[in-house]
């Protein structure tokens, strides 16, 4: 198979290459595709040196599958070009996720959707939604989802390298002048950067994305809409509050889920423990529960603090964490490509 990684020099593109190193996916040719600024950059892949080519009409010639991690506008422009060249596009941007002719796929939940791609494009969901939906899907099969209320705790890397750089810069400034910080006056030494609306160091910011007229942010609306699409439940009530926190990698989500049928915490632990892509860490008395540090650099969605709602036998609470650069982006995109190959649906449209 001839595989292109578009956006290969970015944070997620770099993670894609690292993950592909250890996967069993047979690759005859790996073609890194990057912006004109990064074209010509040499990368190492499976003991070989590969050179990034600039994105353009000829970049996709002979490619079977193209993994995209580029800004929305770049994906909107170049994903159709890659598809018209004969490649199956697996896209990690928001450009195609809600397009009615583009499947939005989480392999653990809706693998057969990958077969129906009339535009030759398959979308991979938002990183926060992925952490949320993997356990939801596992429990929905047993008890039937009725409603979801979730709050996210999103790492700086969700805003890309600029977000991480801004956080480190602010932490360094706070460390150099700790006196006002210890007196609760961190705002005297920290100023907002260009990535987040307030200083992120020593802080949490209850805004991820622009605020809409209804008071919800774009991120909150995306998470809800994408969860409905992946689960195939267009009318499922999903309410989210998305918060940026001063961690580097790993998005956490606190979840309240209501079901059609009664389900208790013990059964939920058993179901989640047997579900693909999930690892249960749930012994809070011994300090065993998911944290971003636990999830960083690892593939599973970690789930813990699983509790029965004391007022409703049909409701559960839990906390889950996934590495937003791996399962939240690069890994899910690669898993979709593996699914396409596995199902033998490698033609552009899957027909």
Q: Predicted regions span which residues?
A:
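N-terminal Rossmann-like NAD(P) cofactor-binding subdomain of oxidoreductases
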Residues: 1-198, 235-237, 261, 299-302, ...
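Helix-loop-beta segment of a Rossmann-like dinucleotide-binding subdomain
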Residues: 116-123, 203-214, 318-320
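A glycine-rich, Thr/Ser-enriched phosphate-binding loop motif common to dinucleotide/cofactor-binding enzymes
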Residues: 120-131, 215-224, 328-332
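Active-site phosphate/pyrophosphate- and oxyanion-stabilizing loops and adjacent acidic/basic residues
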Residues: 137, 225, 270
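Short acidic/glycine-rich loop or secondary-structure boundary segments that cap or lie
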Residues: 158-161, 212-215, 247-251, 265-266
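Oxyanion-binding "anion nests"
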Residues: 188, 192-247
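C-terminal active-site/capping subdomain that shapes the small-molecule cofactor and substrate pocket
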Residues: 235-351
